[in-house]
Regions:
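A solvent-exposed interaction/effector surface
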Residues: 2-182
Length: 182
């Protein structure tokens, strides 16, 4: 066969290859943005006391957004500026049925702030924690952070305790705090 008799590449094949390439690159970009490739770093530290204003919730941890919305409405009626949104997760979802999971959802406040109407105030005492920070999707972060925290506890001779505290900063970083003991 001579070179003159070869047919030009099929335009449909080229388009399919280009679309496949763009889909792979696009999917990789989305996964990168969500944090799937972001490493989790664990540190051991002692926290300060937190003043926590919250609404109690029972049910799936994946359904906390509506409780955050309710807490946002309560806080918006005041002149209080929270330090950060937060959720205190009281139960282990691998041991407790989803509908019975207990949490407290609200805000970390300055110690001099008054109690916002519609919210309950609790002081979270200083404690020794393993802390993981994650910048990306809270769903992916939750999975990656708690897996890494549990592995770190085992590797370093600590026992993880509850309640876990998740602090959601305005810049998209989530800090996952898990109390630990020997």
């Amino acid at each position: 066969m001579s070179l003159n008799n070869q047919q030009p590449p099929n335009k449909l094949l080229i388009a399919a290859l280009a679309a496949s390439f763009l889909a792979i690159v696009g999917t990789g970009g989305i996964l990168y943005y969500l944090g799937i490739f972001t490493p989790v770093t664990i540190t051991k530290e002692t926290t300060s006391n937190y003043q926590f204003a919250y609404i109690p919730h029972t049910g799936a941890y994946s359904q906390l957004q509506s409780v955050f919305d309710e807490a946002d409405r309560a806080l918006s009626e005041t002149d209080i500026s929270p330090i950060a949104r937060a959720a205190l997760l009281q139960d282990d979802p691998s041991l407790i049925p989803e509908e019975n999971l207990r949490s407290k959802v609200g805000f970390i406040l300055s110690t001099h702030d008054r109690t916002p109407p519609g919210l309950i105030i609790e002081e979270i005492p200083s404690r020794v924690i393993a802390s993981a920070t994650f910048n990306g999707s809270p769903v992916i972060g939750s999975y990656k952070a708690y897996s890494a925290l549990k592995e770190w506890c085992v590797a370093n001779g600590f026992k993880p305790r509850l309640p876990a505290l998740e602090i959601y900063y305005d810049d998209g970083v989530v800090e996952y705090q898990l109390p630990i003991s020997r």
